[in-house]
C-alpha cells in the first residue's frame, strides 16, 4: 500500500479570492526562492493560483539576465500577455527580477502595457507596490534599498526541501557578470532570523534546507560582530554550527560558493556536522590563470585545486559540481584546452557550462577581442561532451553501493518509481516494490541499492 504525505495548504485570510495569479520563473535558485515568497504575498492578499497562465488575472515574470537567451525568452512570453492585455485591460502584468532591474524605465517604454516593474531588492514589498498599481499608477521600483526582513510565509513548491536566503546581492566585480548591478550590494540576514525560518520549516515537516546566496561563503562580511581574535563572528561556518541543532531538519546544503572565500575552517565544519551534505558547488569558470585574471575572479587554478584536495582529504566521496564559461573574450585555443584539462584532472560530478554572452554594463562586453559565434558553438559542444563523459564515469562509483535517498515524490514519467536525491545530490529513481505491502511518505530517507548509473542520474531498489 502506498501512502503519500502532503503538507496542507494554508488558507487565504480573505473570504473570497480577488483573482488568480500566475508566476513564471527564469534563472537561478535565488529567483525560485523569490518567486515562492511573492506567491506567498499574493495568496495573503487574496489571490489564488491559476491553473492556466492565459486565464490568470495577474501574471508575474520573475526574470533572469545572466545571458541574452534568457532575456529574449522573457520578451517572447510577454508577447502573449500583451495581446490579452489589449482585450482585458484589468489584467495586471508584472516583470520582476534581474531584467526588470537592468532595464527599468526603458522596459516600460518598450512594453507600455506593463503595470509593475520591480527589481530583486523589492520582492518583500510586492503588496505595497500592487496597491499603488490598484490606485491607477504604472510603477517602476528599481532603486537600491535595504531588503526588509520577510514576514510572509512563502508559497513553496516543495513540501520536503526548502530554500532559505541568507545573503542577498554580491560585492564581487567579475568582468563578465551583471549580478552586482542588478541584485545590489551584499546584505546578510541575521543568524537568529535565518534560524527562525528554518525552525518554521521543520515544524511544517520539511526535511532538507538549502541556504542560498549569490556569493554564499561571503556571508556575514557586512554584519558588525567580531570575535575577540578579530575574526568575523557571523561567517557561513558559524551559521552552519548555529542552525545544525534544529530538530526535524535532516539535511543542509548551501549554494553558490566562491573559491576566494572557501576556507579550511568551512571544510572542517562540513566534515564535522553530519547534517551538512557532501555536495559542494564551487564554480571555477576557466581552467586558465590569465583568463581568470581577466575575469577578475581573484584566485588561481592552483588555489582552486587545493580547495578540492582539502575537501576530498576529509570527504573522499564528496560530490563536486561547478560552472564554466567558454569563449571568454580573447580566450585562445590553448587557454580553452586548459579548461578541458581541469575538468579531466579534477573529475567533476557535473559542470554547468555556457558560452560567454556579453552583458550590459560589464567591462568584458566592450572588449574588442570577442570570440566568433561559430567558435563559441564548437567549444560549448566539445566541453559538454567531456562533461557528460566525466559525469558518467564519476557516477559508476555508486554502482552496487547502498545510498541514503531522501524521497521527494513520484517520477512524473513513471508512476511505479519514486524519485529523490542522495546526500551527494545525485537524482535517483527508486523502483516501488511489487507484490508486497510497502508504506512510505514523501520525506522519508530510504536505503537504496544502486543498480544503474547514467551521466546525470541513478536508479536503484530499496535495500532492507
From Swiss-Prot:
- What are the record keywords, sorted? 4Fe-4S, Cytoplasm, Iron, Iron-sulfur, Metal-binding, S-adenosyl-L-methionine, Transferase, tRNA processing
Question: Where in or outside the cell is it found?
Answer: Cytoplasm
Q: Which residues bind [4Fe-4S] cluster 2?
A: 170, 174, 177
Cofactor field: [4Fe-4S] cluster
The record lists [4Fe-4S] cluster 1 as bound by 28, 64, 98
An annotated GO cellular component of this protein is:
cytoplasm
Tell me the Gene Ontology biological-process terms attached to this UniProt entry. tRNA methylthiolation
Lineage, top-rank taxon, reads Bacteria
Q: Which GO terms describe its molecular function?
A: 4 iron, 4 sulfur cluster binding; metal ion binding; methylthiotransferase activity
Per the record, what are the reactions this protein catalyses? N(6)-dimethylallyladenosine(37) in tRNA + (sulfur carrier)-SH + AH2 + 2 S-adenosyl-L-methionine = 2-methylsulfanyl-N(6)-dimethylallyladenosine(37) in tRNA + (sulfur carrier)-H + 5'-deoxyadenosine + L-methionine + A + S-adenosyl-L-homocysteine + 2 H(+)
Task: Give the Gene3D superfamilies listed for this entry.
Answer: Methylthiotransferase, N-terminal domain, tm_1862 like domain
Q: Which SUPFAM superfamilies match?
A: Radical SAM enzymes (SSF102114)
Q: What is its EC number?
A: 2.8.4.3
Q: Which InterPro entries match?
A: Elp3/MiaA/NifB-like_rSAM, Methylthiotransferase, Methylthiotransferase_CS, Methylthiotransferase_N, Methylthiotransferase_N_sf, MiaB_methiolase, rSAM, rSAM_horseshoe
- Tell me the ranges covered by the MTTase N-terminal domain, including all copies: 19-135
Family affiliation: Belongs to the methylthiotransferase family. MiaB subfamily.
Q: What does this protein do?
A: Catalyzes the methylthiolation of N6-(dimethylallyl)adenosine (i(6)A), leading to the formation of 2-methylthio-N6-(dimethylallyl)adenosine (ms(2)i(6)A) at position 37 in tRNAs that read codons beginning with uridine.
Subunit architecture: Monomer.
Q: What is this protein called?
A: tRNA-2-methylthio-N(6)-dimethylallyladenosine synthase
Give the organism the record lists. Prochlorococcus marinus (strain MIT 9515)
Gene behind this protein: miaB
Amino acid at each position: 500500500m502506498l501512502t503519500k504525505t502532503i503538507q496542507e495548504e494554508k488558507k487565504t485570510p480573505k473570504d473570497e479570492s480577488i483573482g488568480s495569479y500566475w508566476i513564471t520563473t527564469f534563472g537561478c535558485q535565488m529567483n525560485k526562492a523569490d518567486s515562492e515568497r511573492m506567491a506567498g504575498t499574493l495568496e495573503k492578499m487574496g489571490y489564488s493560483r491559476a491553473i492556466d497562465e492565459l486565464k490568470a488575472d495577474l501574471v508575474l515574470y520573475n526574470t533572469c539576465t545572466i545571458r541574452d537567451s534568457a532575456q529574449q525568452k522573457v520578451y517572447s512570453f510577454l508577447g502573449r500577455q500583451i495581446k490579452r492585455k489589449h482585450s482585458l485591460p484589468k489584467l495586471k502584468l508584472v516583470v520582476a527580477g534581474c531584467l526588470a532591474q537592468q532595464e527599468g524605465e526603458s522596459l516600460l517604454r518598450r512594453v507600455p502595457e506593463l503595470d509593475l516593474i520591480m527589481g530583486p531588492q523589492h520582492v518583500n514589498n510586492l503588496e505595497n507596490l500592487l496597491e499603488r498599481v490598484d490606485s491607477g499608477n504604472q510603477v517602476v521600483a528599481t532603486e537600491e534599498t535595504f531588503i526588509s526582513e520577510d514576514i510572509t510565509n512563502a508559497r513553496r513548491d516543495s513540501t520536503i526541501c526548502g530554500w532559505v536566503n541568507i545573503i542577498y546581492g554580491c560585492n564581487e566585480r567579475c568582468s563578465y557578470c551583471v549580478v552586482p548591478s542588478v541584485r545590489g550590494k551584499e546584505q546578510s540576514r541575521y543568524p537568529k532570523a535565518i534560524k527562525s525560518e528554518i525552525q518554521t520549516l521543520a515544524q511544517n515537516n520539511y526535511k532538507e534546507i538549502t541556504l542560498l546566496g549569490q556569493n554564499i561563503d561571503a556571508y556575514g562580511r557586512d554584519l558588525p560582530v567580531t570575535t575577540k581574535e578579530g575574526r568575523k563572528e557571523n561567517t557561513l561556518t558559524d551559521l552552519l554550527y548555529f542552525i545544525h541543532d534544529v530538530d526535524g531538519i535532516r539535511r543542509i546544503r548551501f549554494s553558490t560558493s566562491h573559491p576566494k572565500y572557501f576556507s579550511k575552517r568551512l571544510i572542517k565544519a562540513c566534515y564535522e556536522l553530519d547534517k551538512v551534505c557532501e555536495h559542494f558547488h564551487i564554480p571555477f569558470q576557466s581552467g586558465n590563470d590569465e583568463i581568470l585574471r581577466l575575469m577578475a575572479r581573484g584566485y588561481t587554478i592552483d588555489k582552486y585545486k587545493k580547495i578540492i584536495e582539502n575537501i576530498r582529504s576529509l570527504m573522499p566521496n564528496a560530490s563536486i559540481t561547478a560552472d564554466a564559461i567558454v569563449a571568454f573574450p580573447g580566450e585562445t585555443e590553448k587557454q580553452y584546452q586548459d579548461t578541458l584539462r581541469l575538468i579531466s584532472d579534477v573529475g567533476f560530478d557535473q559542470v554547468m557550462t555556457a558560452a560567454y554572452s556579453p552583458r550590459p554594463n560589464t567591462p568584458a562586453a566592450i572588449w574588442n577581442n570577442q570570440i566568433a559565434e561559430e567558435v563559441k558553438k564548437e567549444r560549448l559542444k566539445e566541453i559538454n561532451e567531456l562533461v557528460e563523459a566525466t559525469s558518467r564515469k564519476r557516477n559508476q562509483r555508486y554502482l552496487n553501493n547502498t545510498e541514503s535517498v531522501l524521497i521527494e515524490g513520484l517520477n512524473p514519467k513513471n508512476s511505479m518509481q519514486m524519485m529523490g536525491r542522495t546526500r551527494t545530490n545525485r537524482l535517483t529513481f527508486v523502483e516501488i516494490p511489487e507484490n508486497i505491502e510497502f508504506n512510505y511518505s514523501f520525506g522519508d530517507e530510504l536505503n537504496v541499492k544502486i543498480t544503474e548509473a547514467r551521466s546525470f542520474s541513478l536508479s536503484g531498489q530499496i535495500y532492507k
